[in-house]
């Protein structure tokens, strides 16, 4: 029943957060940037597949429980894959992480940590706020049908997925900070298009925002051991994940309260403010790192 669904969401979230942090840390330390981008492009495949599985099960059985049972089977399959692949993980060196109190104090004193966390918070706030509220904006403010609006939201996530796949190739030719800057610039362009009162431009803006989002998150994650040291990577990865999830959890409903009070016409403005916070975080981080290297 629904109560049990809410209760099991807690251990599911704890497990997902642990796997997320550990897997990102492992890939960041041992693989190239292209692998991190391709890893996160498959997040897009999963994010797209989940609603499709639920919709299919609802149409076939009329019961939402079957959708969750199907996803549970996928989760147990994932657990089995992770368990059987553990010997492969042990082939790679594991740096000593600073788990002591002194180590944690050292982490907090690393230069660039604060703007780095701001960037993670703001990025995830932009990503999920766009995905959750874009369809409503297109219907109520641009007069699109629900079908077209849903297609626009799907195009947004498709942009993230395809963009990350392509970014896997681009990461070999461009510096990490330039990939992030390019992504942030595309997000700003997409948001500006959403201010304009033309449905086709709003749809295009949504797709551009998705493409802009593509390189930012995996690139920031992959640079963690290089910017802050491999010995700090595991602890920092967890801290970054936690900060990102705070952005995911708090900002979309907060933006919903604002647009509910003042109207969905303020949705692009809310996205713009979050995007400017992302600009501040990424550029401040670049400045701190440049000063360290000087």
Show the residue positions of the predicted features.
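Symmetry-related core transmembrane helices of the 12-TM Major Facilitator Superfamily/SLC fold
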Residues: 66-87, 266-284
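C-terminal transmembrane helical hairpin of 12-TM major facilitator-type secondary transporters
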Residues: 174-220
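Cytoplasmic helix-loop-helix junction between adjacent transmembrane helices
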Residues: 8-42
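Juxtamembrane intracellular "pre-TM" segments in multi-pass secondary transporters
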Residues: 89-117
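Extracytoplasmic gate region of multi-pass secondary transporters
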Residues: 111-162
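Interfacial helix-cap and linker-helix signal at transmembrane-aqueous boundaries
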Residues: 53-62, 138-139, 170-171, 254-263
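A late C-terminal transmembrane helix in Major Facilitator Superfamily
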Residues: 230-264
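Loop-to-transmembrane helix entry/capping segments in MFS-fold secondary transporters
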Residues: 32-42, 146-147, 230-240
């Amino acid at each position: 029943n629904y109560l049990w669904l809410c209760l099991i969401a807690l251990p599911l979230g704890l497990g997902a957060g642990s796997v997320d942090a550990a897997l990102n840390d492992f890939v960041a330390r041992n693989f190239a940037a292209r692998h991190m981008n391709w890893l996160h492009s498959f997040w897009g495949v999963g994010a797209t597949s989940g609603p499709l599985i639920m919709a299919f099960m609802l149409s076939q059985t009329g019961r939402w429980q079957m959708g969750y049972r199907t996803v549970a089977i996928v989760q147990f399959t994932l657990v089995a894959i992770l368990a059987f692949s553990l010997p492969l993980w042990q082939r790679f060196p594991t740096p000593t992480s600073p788990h002591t109190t002194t180590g944690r104090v050292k982490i907090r004193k690393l230069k660039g940590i604060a703007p780095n966390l701001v960037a993670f918070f703001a990025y995830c706030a932009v990503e999920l706020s766009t995905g959750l509220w874009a369809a409503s904006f297109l219907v109520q403010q641009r007069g699109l049908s629900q079908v077209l609006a849903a297609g626009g939201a799907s195009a947004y996530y498709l942009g993230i997925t395809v963009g990350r796949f392509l970014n896997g190739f681009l990461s070999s030719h461009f510096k990490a900070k330039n990939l992030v800057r390019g992504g942030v610039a595309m997000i700003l362009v997409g948001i500006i298009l959403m201010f304009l009162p033309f449905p086709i431009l709003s749809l295009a803006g949504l797709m551009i925002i998705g493409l802009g989002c593509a390189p930012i998150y995996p690139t920031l994650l992959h640079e963690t051991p290089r910017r802050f040291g491999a010995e700090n990577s595991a602890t920092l990865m967890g801290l970054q994940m936690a900060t990102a999830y705070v952005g995911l959890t708090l900002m979309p409903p907060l933006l919903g309260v604002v647009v509910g009070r003042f109207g969905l016409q303020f949705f692009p403005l809310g996205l713009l403010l979050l995007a400017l916070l992302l600009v501040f975080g990424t550029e401040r981080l670049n400045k701190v790192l440049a000063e360290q290297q000087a």
